[in-house]
Amino acid sequence: MSARSERACMLCGIIQPFRKFVDFGCPNCESVLHFQDNEDNQVQDCTSPSFEGLVALGDETKSPGGERLRIDSFVAGLYAVKINGKLPPHIIGDLADQNISYRPRDGSAED
């Protein structure tokens, strides 16, 4: 993976190239974050190029790692264990308006 193009969604943690987020959106969060065909700013604000660790989630598998990271109901792919950065306050507010609780994936949230 290239550190210059790969980014992690700050809401679900999936890792994709920047251009894929812009062209196709996030496969898990598109209905709430609206990356597809949006200005690059939305992708810049809601994804991070700085992440640690990888977890591979396969099709139709129950992974203990997936459950611990709260990604077991997401599409198959590579996910970041820890993502440096947080969503901007206005995005967190938009999520709250939709009754979606944001849990940062930077290690600051407690269970």
Swiss-Prot record:
Location comes to: Nucleus; Chromosome, Centromere
A GO MF term:
zinc ion binding
Gene Ontology cellular-component terms for this entry are: chromosome, centromeric region; DSIF complex
In terms of one coarse class, where is the protein primarily found? nucleus
User: Which domain of life does the UniProt lineage start with?
Assistant: Eukaryota
A biological process term (GO) from this entry? regulation of DNA-templated transcription
SUPFAM superfamilies for this protein: RNA polymerase subunits (SSF63393)
Q: Which UniProt keywords apply?
A: Centromere, Chromosome, Metal-binding, mRNA processing, Nucleus, Transcription, Zinc, Zinc-finger
Q: Where are the zinc fingers (C4-type)?
A: 9-29
Q: Which family does it belong to?
A: Belongs to the SPT4 family.
PANTHER family on file? SUPPRESSOR OF TY 4, TRANSCRIPTION ELONGATION FACTOR SPT4
User: Subunit comment for this entry?
Assistant: Component of the SPT4-SPT5 complex. Interacts with RNA polymerase II.
Q: What does this protein do?
A: The SPT4-SPT5 complex mediates both activation and inhibition of transcription elongation, and plays a role in pre-mRNA processing. This complex seems to be important for the stability of the RNA polymerase II elongation machinery on the chromatin template but not for the inherent ability of this machinery to translocate down the gene.
- Protein's UniProt name: Transcription elongation factor SPT4
Report the source organism: Debaryomyces hansenii (strain ATCC 36239 / CBS 767 / BCRC 21394 / JCM 1990 / NBRC 0083 / IGC 2968)
